[in-house]
Amino acid sequence: ERDEVRKVVRDRHDRSAIRHMEAKNYTNLEECVVTTIEETYPDYNRFDKLTGKTDTVDAVIVDCLGFTIGPNYENLPLLFPYDQLQQAGILPAGLSNDQVKSFYGCLTGKIKELYRTPDLFTIALFDEPGVPTEVADAMQQCASMVVSPADQAKADAKAKTDANSAPAQNGK
């Protein structure tokens, strides 16, 4: 039974709210969904006979994501980890902890303006396979506020230096 619920969660992995999660956080989300279903439907046969079974799992996913994000959106880095934002070209490599913290603070403020509650934000992320345009725009705005051109050049130089000083792989 648990495997079936996990499969439904995995089938939703293309949703932007889930796609960007690191493996550990995704596993926690999956466990939250399975546990919630088991607690709500201790007799699995009742759950299995629901006509809207996948809709029920979707609703539980949204609830678990809302819980994961936190009441004040304090856990946005779990949904949009810095390294993934860096790979996507939104943030440069080599930002200081203060700059990363400022970025997430800015993003939190903009998302609060766009979505009144974490649940509404979660629904928006879950409904679309990609990041909603409004959220992507907010990310770009926050990145440009946090990273000055001089900081960008400095971060790029640091990343290049770090890459050049990394040990060679495969024995080369």
Language model regions located:
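Mature extracellular/luminal domains of secreted and GPI-anchored eukaryotic proteins, especially small
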Residues: E1-K172
